[in-house]
Design a protein with these regions (language model features):
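C-terminal and inter-domain tail/linker signature
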Residues: 1-152
Length: 152
C-alpha cells in the first residue's frame, strides 16, 4: 500500500474535502458529489435516505487523517418523515452514529466506506428487537394466546 507522508497542512486539506462532502449531503446538493469518483453509491443512496429524513444533519465528532485516508466518526440527526426500508413515517427524531473512511487522491474522494448504525435506527423505529430485548409490538402476535411472532 502506498503510504506517502503528508504534512499537517495537507492533512487539513484532506479533512476539509471530507467536510465539504458532508456539508453537501446536509444541503442535499448531490450534484456536488459527482466530482468524486468514490461517491457513486452515495449519490445513488442518499436521495432515498434524505427523503426519509429531510432535515438530516451531520455532526463530525472526531476526524483523523493518515496518509491519503481520512477517518471520520459522526452523528446523524433527523426526523423520520418519509418511508424508510418499508417503515412508514413516524415523525420520530432519531440520532445514530456513522463511521466513514475516505481515500483522497488529487483532491477527490476516490474510495468511500460508510458504516452507519442502521440496526440501531430500526430498533428505535420499533422494527427489530434490541439485543436481549423484547420484540417490538409490531412484531408480536396480535393473539396473545398464539405462539408469538411468525417469520415468513
Amino acid at each position: 500500500m502506498n503510504r506517502r507522508r503528508l504534512s499537517p497542512c495537507q492533512w487539513k486539506k484532506t479533512k476539509a474535502i471530507v467536510g465539504r462532502f458532508l456539508e453537501a449531503l446536509d444541503q442535499q446538493n448531490f450534484d456536488a458529489l459527482k466530482e468524486h469518483p468514490g461517491l457513486y453509491q452515495t449519490v445513488v443512496r442518499q436521495p432515498i435516505i434524505r427523503a426519509a429524513f429531510p432535515d438530516l444533519r451531520t455532526t463530525v465528532e472526531h476526524q483523523v487523517a493518515e496518509g491519503d485516508t481520512v477517518a471520520t466518526r459522526a452523528t446523524m440527526r433527523g426526523t423520520h418523515r418519509g418511508p424508510l426500508f418499508g417503515v412508514e413515517p413516524t415523525n420520530q427524531q432519531l440520532t445514530w452514529s456513522v463511521l466513514l473512511m475516505d481515500r483522497i487522491v488529487d483532491g477527490k474522494i476516490v474510495l468511500h466506506h460508510a458504516n452507519a448504525d442502521w440496526i440501531g435506527v430500526l430498533v428505535k423505529l420499533g422494527v427489530v428487537a434490541a439485543p436481549g430485548g423484547e420484540l417490538p409490538r409490531r412484531l408480536q402476535a396480535e393473539d396473545t394466546g398464539g405462539d408469538g411472532p411468525t417469520r415468513d
